Amino acid sequence: MNKTIISSIGAALVCVVATVNGADLAGSAPFQFRYDEALSKLPDQVAPKVPGAHGGFAVDNKTGEVFFGLKGAGIIWMSNDLKEKKVLPVTEPMILEGNFHNTTVLYRGDGERFLALPDNEKHRVYIVSDEGKLASVLNSPMDLNDYYGGGGAFNPTDTEYADGKLYVADGYSAGNFISIADPWSASWTDTYFGGKASGAREYGLFGTAHGITLEPHTKRLAIADRANSRVQDFDFHGTFLENVNLPAGSLPCDIDFFQGNVLVGCLRGPSGYQSAPCYVVDKDGNLISEVNPKKDFGLELFTHIHNAAWKPVYGKGGKVEKLYALATAWNPGGFAVMEVVK
């Protein structure tokens, strides 16, 4: 199945910027956003490393905690309410030097929590405890197919944990495969899917398999095919299910889900855009809101967005008390927290 969300941004959505109680809002109800400067601050010790940020963060949907892998700094932990932030006491040089391209939370069968951190520069994936201790490393899957066996590059850009397996998107290589591993034994399975698309933009293949996200309700793997400005859905066996086109030139880096609504962080934006947007798309594929951090809030670092994620704040009994969107900028790096204002 093929869908096109929008062919013309102007015809599909009017981006509203209003002032309420002295605070600028951007986007369309029910997803209007307000920049939170206080919550966007990171620990002073990592400030020199932020301009080089090339990664993303993971939200633990059990606890609300956030983990953010940052090259040269290690791993930043954030509390459920985003008011507390600290750098985990990482001492392993391999982790400190890693170019963490994204972050994934995964729970082992015994309830222990770990993080998966793909490193596109060092060509591997780290499995790390939630205290920052290195547990294992996944190197290139040399025995998987002729591409890797012949010395093809392994430059992983994202991972997702689903059905007890770790799915690894190799988006910055010529292969563009999705490889599947057992993270607990640090071993690759013999299963993979995808590959490099041609100019015909074949379904099931990728221009850049940049981000991979589990849709929790449908149990699909949604893969942001950045170069082709689209999102492709697959089952856990790698069977292609659906294609959703985004505006040409938007270059989606990754997507995230909250109660059926999709947050899409884009590297650029359609023709005519001077800076990158985050889109909100509903469960029926309709574009219902848009926020552009640079244009709307004057965040000069946000010409390009490299990652965006929903951040619910959980109260007693798991009730969602607030909802934020987190975003990282690229080249230079930056970090922003935007509250969804009801």
Where are these regions (language model features)?
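A short helix->beta-strand "capping" segment at the edge of beta-propeller domains
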Residues: 23-50
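Beta-propeller fold detector
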Residues: 31-41, 85-92, 135-142, 188-197, ...
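Beta-rich, blade/repeat-based domains predominating
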Residues: 45-62, 93-112, 143-165, 198-220, ...
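Conserved beta-strand positions in repeat-built beta-propeller and related beta-rich domains
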Residues: 61, 66-71, 116-121, 129, ...
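Short loop/turn segments that connect beta-strands within beta-propeller blades
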Residues: 79-83, 129-133, 182-186, 235-239, ...
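Structural motif
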Residues: 176-179, 272-278, 333-339
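Blade-level signature of beta-propeller repeat domains, shared across WD40, Kelch, NHL, RCC1
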Residues: 303-342
